[in-house]
Structure formats: structure tokens, C-alpha cells
Amino acid sequence: MKKIALFLFLLNSAFLFAQKEVSGVVKDKSGNPLPGVNIVEKGTSNGVSTDFEGGFRIKVKDGATLVFSYVGFSTVEKATSGEKISVILDESGGQILSDVVVVGSRSAKRTVVDSAVPIDVINVKDVTTQSGKLEINELLQYAAPSFNANKQSGSDGADHVDPASLRGMGPDQTLVLINGKRRHQSSLINLFGTRGRGNTGTDLNAIPAASIKRIEILRDGAAAQYGSDAIAGVINIVTNDNVKEFTGAITYGAFNTDAKGDFPEGTANTKGYRLDQKGFGNSFGKNQDFDGGSVKVAANYGVPVGTKGGYVNVTGEFLNKNKTLRPGFDFRKGFGEAEMKGVNLFVNFAVPIADKTELYVFGGSNFRDTDAYAFTRNDGERVVEEIYPGGYTPRITSKINDNSVAAGIRTESGGGWKFDFSNTLGKNKFSYDIKGTLNASLEEKSPTEFDAGGHSLLQNTTNFDVSKNYGDILGGLNLAFGTEFRIEKFEIFAGEEGSYATYDTNGVPITDPTTQSAPTIPNPDYDPADPDSSPTISRPGGSQGFPGYSPANEVNKNRTNFSLYTDAELDITQSLMVSGAVRYENYSDFGSTVNGKLASRLKITDKINLRGSVSTGFRAPSLAQIYYNLRFTNFSSGGATEVLLAPNDSEITRAFGIQKLNEEKALNASLGFTANFGDFTATVDGYLINVKDRIVLTGYFDATALGTNVDKAQFFVNGVDTKTTGLDVVVSWKKNINENRFSAALVGNINDMKIDKIKNGSLPANTFFGERDKAFLLASAPPNKFALNLNYGRKWFDAGLAFTRFSEVKLLDYQMDEDPEDYRTSPTETDAQVFENQKRAATDTYGAKIVTDLTLGFKLSKSTKLSIGANNLLNIYPDQQDDWVEAGGYWDAVQMGFNGAYYYARLGFNF
């Protein structure tokens, strides 16, 4: 690899390459500044947007031409003869904003408008200044029609890392790129009480929003272009490269604690019964009108490096969020969002080292310290009164480290061939500390805090990409090919002994249940007439709230992946473009796969384009899905009861007839159109996603017959085939009238997923993947979501009003786990009728809701702006449910979430 890099350097060292910085102002014919004008160096993907005052700075090659485009205005091309440019845009003959994109096409000239596949381009600076959203997942939840993410509660690790998805697919079925380079996933696998259970995803919140120029969302299958995971689409995050500009903001906000609902007297976190966070999680303290207070401080600054257009751009971000507490049942007094303290640093660097040759480095470090309440222990064998009189609510705290760095060389030969050689290293480490807890088998001698171990994932990716544009072949041919080599390593590391062990009455870890026994307490439900009833109950071991990983759980596994791809786009005429891609992948642990893609765009008129694509795709099983395991032991007078989430390569897994995990296989198709009528633009795209062999997590199987001292077993399996159809809609309008700027956008997604097949083989279907599991999978996204965004601005003031409608969502609660006979209403009912009774009782229906966001912005000076506003202004909550809800509160984590109205103020600056 070093020889290749040296060869590329020597190949181009003879050429001298000069860049310069050009700045200026863009105005309309009346002299009003135009913010958000798209500016692109012609023939490249190098581009910026104008700021609030219409100003811009951009680094370009000598002699470059800049293209200025803005919705409702004529596009203007301007040569960069000097360092200062003044541009006047004419409202006649308006054109659609044509963002040049990196994702979805390897052509440096392809824009959103003329792409053959749907792409959203989100200007993060605009979104962050026009809303109170603090993290990337929150921003995208309301800015992108098919993106969905929600804060979780009572879901162990998922309380600390939000699961997110595109088009209702799994969190691991969307590929994330940073500046076109593959981003590593989180080491966390979602297991309990959350969407995306059995999946790993990429933690977008580990990337500071202030470091991002724009986010490109390719809403189409792209495994043939980018490899594994790109079944639902690709999210490419393009980071800032501006210089001589110091920007940032200080934001403070808090949530309204007045949760709307009809709650019984004494309900935790209602008036007079707010959980006292200074106690053990089982006593009440003072009322609060607001909670979840958050402070975010972010800054971004870039400086030139050398005199030929080099730069280093640095972002720092600090975010502190307190817990929210919402009405919960007696067994979940700490229902609400986790507390979080986070520090983010990101650096983007590039410098020319020869003619048309650039060295680049980018990467960041994110650290988060999080704290979430688990379920409450009120009494019984899990409570030691000497430590926690009256019970306690344990806290699951975590330390999350996310680090990444990418480095590479980009160059262009004299013949127009472009080469990009890079290496990207990323690692996520997730450590658990359980606080306010105990190991009940140690009784009053138990510590109240344990190191419970954790897990990590390392990914190293090496890429070599080549491309060339042939302008003389028909309307233009862009040819690209390349290779990728990836190494992945997954680890589970054990916690301290007390976090996982069960101790006998002498305080010695139990290794032989025939000679050792755990401490017991009297069984309050003992029935002498019942031969299965015991007069005593054994105290369980391990840290309450989250049992630690033991040495038996430890894993240190790795694999490699090698891929080759080719990608071509041909403009047959000015109206017709076709593209195709083929990619070969070989994994060291499961074998190889080949995938392809065809796409086309037809200009029906100057204003309307028709586009469509069809592709095959795949997702390799993650190392976590193959090797993750949990093993914990319950002891009673009758002996040991062991429960195991078995790794895919275990003997127990094979004994149940469950096969080695294979890749998920997908077929994607899309058809849509774009329309541009000056001030008005629209895109509508329908899609089909068929996925075979989706990897899911089974229910608990009886394993006592295996003779392996395991009583219950659970597995990852290629268990489900799904079919998803849907429609994405984006309609926008912009108009400038004198000094007034008006804009409106309607974005929406309609999504329908069906389960075609449950691949349970000879195993009982309801245990393999039961009704509750199906409901959680199908509710990964609301059946439809629409948002109407209205904006107004002038020199010193701007305002935004947004309405987001979430459709009805249905889930099945814990009543599906009860004895079906409890739901028999007549002795003559059939089992099928009883089942329907139970399912009807277990159905939690969340009716459609509309959420309103409002923001007001005031220019205090040329460099400072004050914004105030509210997310969920009218304090809307999902419909209230009963005490069978998964998370122990009165709502699941659906639609707009369970936190209510959020009010904020932000002071932004730009020097």
C-alpha cells in the first residue's frame, strides 16, 4: 500500500497546482442579500452556500468558473478573475437548487435534480438555526421524510444510543459515510424493549452537528455501489471545510413536565409524586415545572494551510442533558429519557502537495457519560432492606467512546484519471457501570455499584477508487472502479465478579449448586397444597438493573472483507441518462456475494424528469449478531436455572436446528419524477424493498432437554422475509418579494411493511417469532409521516412554523405473554377465538397526532443572532396506555416521543 501511495505521488509531482480563495456577496435585483444560494465550482463537487447576509467564501482553482443557483432565480456562471465577486440574480427563468452530491453517483458533475435516484440534501446550518433540535437524529427525524428515530426508555443500552432507520428498515440496513468513507457502527446490539431489536446501527449522535456542512440521504438500495448495509439507503455526512470564519452557538432548553393524561393518584412523576433523584429511586421529592434541562455549546473555526487552498477546520461541542421523568407505573418510577454529558471534537484537514494532488485527513473523538433508570425493585428477593429500605430503582450508566480517523491522497493525472487512496479507522467502546444497585445474594454486604463490563467494535477500511469522465462519448460517460479491504473486530469484556456472580450463604461464588445454595427469603405466595410451590425464594445474583458480563461471555472475534466494484454513468443524449454498477464482496466468515444495479433518468421536458432504478443488495450478519451472548444463572432450592442468549456458533444453537447466519438478500426498485416550475419544485418516488432472510432475535425456547444445564435459550436467526412498499414526497416553494423571503415545503413518507414468511422450520412459530415480535418489527416506522414547513425572513428577523403529522401506530404489549385461558370469555370459544381475544386486549393503539414547532430569530448585529422557540409547542403526547406497556410508562417510544414540549433559546455567532 505504501508503494502505491508513493507511485501516485511521484506520478503527479511534476504538476504544480494553485488554488485561491474567492469571496463575495449575492443579491437580488433590488439589492437584498440572498441567503442559501448554492455556489459550485463548475465541473467539480466543490461548493458552498451563502450566509444570512448573502456572503460566501470558497477555495477554487485558478481560472475556475463559479455557478450560482437559487430556487426562483436564473442560474449565473461567473469567472473568478479576481478575489472579490459581486453577483446579482434575476428572478426570471428560475431554476431548481442543484446541489452537487457525493452520494449516489461517482460523477463529480451529478446534481440532485438530474440524479437517477432520490437524494435529500439537508443544509445542517440552516436546520440547526431554524429549530431547537440538538442532535443529528432529532434533526433528521423532522427534516427527512423517511428517517425515523426516537429516544428510548427502559431498553438497557438503547436508552443511551438511539436506534434509527430509513423507510422502516432495520438500523443496520442503512450505510453511513463520512465524506464518502464508510463509518463504523456502534458495538451495541439492541435487545430489550426497543425498535430494531437484534440489530446494530451507526451512532449518528457521535458526530457533532456543528462540524457538518450538509447531509446527503440516498433513498435507494445501493449495495452494488457501496457494499453491505446499504439496503434502505445511504447517509453521507459532508463536513465543513470553510476558513477564516468563526461560527458557533450556545443553546439552552428544557421540557415541560406537565404530561397530559388521566393518571391515578400517587402515580410516579405526577404532581406531588415526582421521583427524588437524590435518593435511591423509591422516594418522592419536590415538584418541577421543567426538567431535562440541556446546555449545548458548539464552535467551528477554519484556518488556511499554506497558500494553495489548504485548510484545517476544527469543531468542538459540549452537550449536557438532564434526565426527564414522566408518569410511570409502580414498577418503573424512573420512566423517562436518560441523562447525558458529552464532548465532541472533529477535525477536517486538506492540503495540496503537488499539481492536482491533495492530502486529506479527517476524524473525531466523542465521549459520552450517560445515566438512565432501570426498573424499580419495590420488595421481594431483589430488595435488601438494610441497604435500601422500601426498595430502590437501579441506574444503568455508561461510558461511550467513539473515535475515528481517515487519511488519504486524491490526485488527477494529466489524462483526466482521478485516483483516491484512503484508510479509515474507527472504534466504538461501550462500558457499563451499574449504580444504586446491589447483588442480592450478598445481602447486606453487597456493594451498591458495579463495573459490569461492556463491548467494543473496531473497523479498519482501506479504499482505492479510480474514475474518469469522457466528455466526448455521446453526452458524457463517467467510469469508476475500485477496491476495498475491511477488517472488523468485536469484543465483549467481563465486569467485576460481583456484577455477574451468585454467592452462597458463606459469600462464596456458587460453582456447584448441589453443594452450595444462595441465601433465601420466605415466599409470600407459598401454597402448601401446590407441589411446585416452595416456602422460600432464593436471592438472585448479579447487579440488579443490568447483570454484568462474565468471563464465560467474553468474545474476541474478527473477520476480513474484500470487494471489487465498477460503476458507470452514460448520458446517451441530453435527455436520457443510464447508469449501472456491479460489486463483488468476499467475507472471511460466510463467503462471497455479487450484486448489481441499473438506473436511468429521462428528461420528459425541460421541467420534468422521470427516474427509476432496480438493484440487488445484501447485508452481512454483524459480528455482534454472530458472537454476542448473555449468560446468567438463577438459583432456587431445586437447583440452577440458566438462561442463555446463545451465540450463533454454539452447540446449543445447532442442537435446535438453527443454521449458521447468512447474509440478508434484498431486491430494490424505485420509480419517480422531479418537477421544476421556477419557484415551485416537487419530487415523488415510489419504492419496493424485498428482503429475504432478515436476521431477527427469537423468543425464549425450553432447553431443559438438551442436558447442557441451560433451561431457556434464545438465538439470532435468518428468520423473516419482508416486503416494504412506499412513497416519498418532497414539494417546495420559494419566493422573494422585495426584502421579504418566503418558503414552504411539504415532505412526507408513506410506508407499508408486510411479513411474507416466518422461517421457523419445525420450531414453534409463536416462540420463534411471535405476535409481539412481529408488531415491533412492523412498527419500526409510522405508516405515514408528513411535515409542512413554513418560513419567513428579512434582514433582521426570521420565523419558522412546522407541522408534523404522525400516523396511527399499533403495538402489542405484555398481555400476549399471559396465559391465553385468562382471555376466554366462553367455554365454547375455539383456541383461535381465544387468541384473537388476547391479541385484541394486548393491542395498544396510538392515534394520529400533529406536532407543532415554532422558532423566531432576531439579528442582534451583523455577527450575532438570538433565536427562541419551542419543539412540540402544544405539548402533545402519544395516547395514554395501561400498565402492560413495554417500557413501564404510559407510552411507548413512538411518534413524537414521551417528553412533551421543549422550549429553548439560542445565541448564535458568525465572525
Model-derived segments and spans:
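Short acidic/polar hinge/loop motifs at secondary-structure boundaries
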Residues: F56-K59, K181-R219, G266-A268, G279
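Transmembrane beta-barrel wall of Gram-negative outer-membrane proteins
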Residues: K244-T247, N269-A374, E385, P394-G408, ...
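Outer-membrane beta-barrel transmembrane domain signature of Gram-negative proteins
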Residues: Y392-A406, G414, L425, T437-M577, ...
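C-terminal beta-signal and adjacent terminal beta-strands/loops
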Residues: F7, V691, R805-A832, G857-F911
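N-terminal periplasmic accessory domains that precede
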Residues: E83-D90, I136-L139, A143, D162-A164, ...
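Gram-negative outer-membrane beta-barrel transporters
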Residues: F481, G686-K692, T698, D702-M816
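Short, acidic, small-residue-rich periplasmic hinge/interaction motif at the N-terminus
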Residues: K27-K42, T65-F73, G82-T129
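Extracytoplasmic beta-strand/coil segments of soluble accessory domains associated
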Residues: R57-K59, N137-S186, G233
